C-alpha cells in the first residue's frame, strides 16, 4: 500500500494552502513592482 498517491487528502490540502499563501505574495510583489516602475498616480490607482 502506497502513501504517495496524488489524491491523498493531506497532499491536496498542502497544495491548496500553498496556492492561498502564494497568491497574495505574488499580488503584493506585482503591485510593488508596478508602483516602483510606474510612479504615475493614475496607474497606481488603477492597480489598487
From Swiss-Prot:
Major location (coarse): membrane
Keyword annotations: Membrane, Transmembrane, Transmembrane helix
Domain of life: Eukaryota
GO annotations of cellular component type: membrane
Subcellular location: Membrane
Membrane topology category: Single-pass membrane protein
Protein name listed in UniProt: Uncharacterized protein YOR161C-C
Organism of provenance: Saccharomyces cerevisiae (strain ATCC 204508 / S288c) (Baker's yeast)
Amino acid at each position: 500500500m502506497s502513501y504517495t498517491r496524488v489524491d491523498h487528502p493531506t497532499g491536496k490540502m498542502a497544495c491548496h494552502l500553498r496556492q492561498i499563501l502564494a497568491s497574495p505574495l505574488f499580488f503584493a510583489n506585482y503591485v510593488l513592482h508596478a508602483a516602483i516602475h510606474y510612479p504615475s498616480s493614475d496607474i497606481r490607482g488603477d492597480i489598487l
